[in-house]
Amino acid sequence: MKVSLSFLLTILIVIITIKVNLSQEIKISPFFANNLKFEPIPDYIEYDSDSDAGEALFLSNYLDDHKTAKQKSCVDIGAPFQSCDKLLEIDSNLRDTEDFFTFTGFITVNETYNSNTFFWFLESQNGDKNSPLVIFLQGGPGGASTFSLFVETGPYELLDNFTLVQREITWNSEFAMLYIDNPVGTGFSFTDSQEGYSNNEDEIATNLYTFLQQFYKLYPEYYTNELYITGESYAGKYIPAFSYHIIQQNQNSNNPNINLKGIAIGDGLCDPITQVTQYANLAFYTGLADLQQQEVMFEYQDKIVEAINQEQWSVANDLFTDLINGPPDYFQNITGESDYYDIRKTVEPTYGGDFTAFLNQSSIRAMIHVGNNYFQNNNDVYIHLEQDIPKSVKQLFPTILDNIKVILYNGQFDFIVGPSLTETMIRTIEWEGIQPFLESPKIIWKIPSDNVDVAGFVRQWNSFTQVVVRQAGHMVPLDQPARAFDMIDRFINNEPFPSG
């Protein structure tokens, strides 16, 4: 059989294209990989992602008409939230009712590049309009906060038949929750230009601040409420940068004061140059590596630190990938484990529903006002931030700690950003309160609903709290929802952690 040269060239091009695409997918998210596994779409689900989903809602067009903005952005998602028809009965102020609603839409953060940030805002289910406003930011870079809404902290859990059920334990039961797909290009957030993507934490913080200023104009009832910024993993970079930017802007008398009270970072990458030095010891003392393998990991760590010190950012990223963020990588080769989110598990777990496929249904996209925009894991987000990943935000903590409350928490069994990585970073913060904090006793923490089992360990001094949550991995609210809620509730409400 004769095979033409053009046919062979075509096959070769296809193979090369596939390899390139696969290599790009592997690089999407080094610290919060968006390749978390989900069940495939069941055969009996009619997947209608290609159908028209109507017009997207750009709320920046309604900054002078917040009544219309609320009516247009309201989502009829069902219990426990009120029907949007009931919103029409309210004159304009959400504080006029104890009913609670949920809202979605886009806010334009850069008109030049048509950069638009998607959000999902859920009023507190307790009906108290004075409830703190809690922003949740996912990691990545490129992890959508919608993940937490459906998998960790939000009021809904997605089953594998595309059915939403109410989550038994949700942060939304006591707090107004604002999930932001950040940075631009993540999830439903998008930009029309490569110039619209963020290249560093300053640009991300500026976009988030622009977003928040407009959010308060659209939902002015929440402007005076206490604000907390929370998140996990690579959001350990976003949250300090964003909160520091707010503090700086608050000190400018020309800007309206934002009532920021605290930040909460779970298993956060904040200072790569110190945190990366802990992998060899962590692997050895948990029995995952022997002495010889520990030495190899020490060599990797030293090379990463050297690359960071020399500002060779791409080299540092590549070395990190070789050490732990493949596959293939050294960690997986010596342990046989691919789940660095939880050392108790060999492979990443499969979650009960594919929230990406669920959100991309045309009926859902129409309901949440995104139109024909699609939820995506955008590799461009990572590419633009690649040079910023090894850089630190630790230098921002002294100013933050002098102005607001801070809680840093870790899951006991997380490997990628485990407790020892956070502890090492904390000990190098140049803050006047760091020594009394380190000298404060660690207490054993138990929650009222389970006064037998130890929930975790807490160290606290003035505005600074550190928590290790027992029996949890990288995603604490998923692994230990009751403990995570008790922790965040006590932190926000200034309640002491009960000891055993």
Curated annotation (Swiss-Prot):
What are the annotated glycosylation sites? 110, 161, 333, 360
Annotated Gene Ontology cellular component terms: extracellular region
Instruction: Give the family, as the similarity comment puts it.
Output: Belongs to the peptidase S10 family.
Molecular-function annotations in GO = serine-type carboxypeptidase activity
Q: Encoded by which gene?
A: cpvl
What is this protein for, i.e. what is its function? Answer: May be involved in the digestion of phagocytosed particles in the lysosome, participation in an inflammatory protease cascade, and trimming of peptides for antigen presentation.
Signal sequence coordinates: 1-23
| Keyword Glycoprotein among UniProt keywords | yes
Under the heading Gene3D superfamilies, the entry gives: alpha/beta hydrolase (3.40.50.1820)
Annotated GO biological processes are:
proteolysis
InterPro entries, alphabetically? Answer: AB_hydrolase_fold, Peptidase_S10, Ser_caboxypep_his_AS, Ser_caboxypep_ser_AS
Q: Which UniProt keywords apply?
A: Carboxypeptidase, Glycoprotein, Hydrolase, Protease, Secreted, Signal, Zymogen
What is the protein's given name? Probable serine carboxypeptidase CPVL
* Key word Hydrolase present: yes
Q: What class of enzyme is it?
A: hydrolase
Instruction: State its location(s).
Output: Secreted
The active site annotation covers: 233, 414, 474
Q: What is its EC number?
A: 3.4.16.-
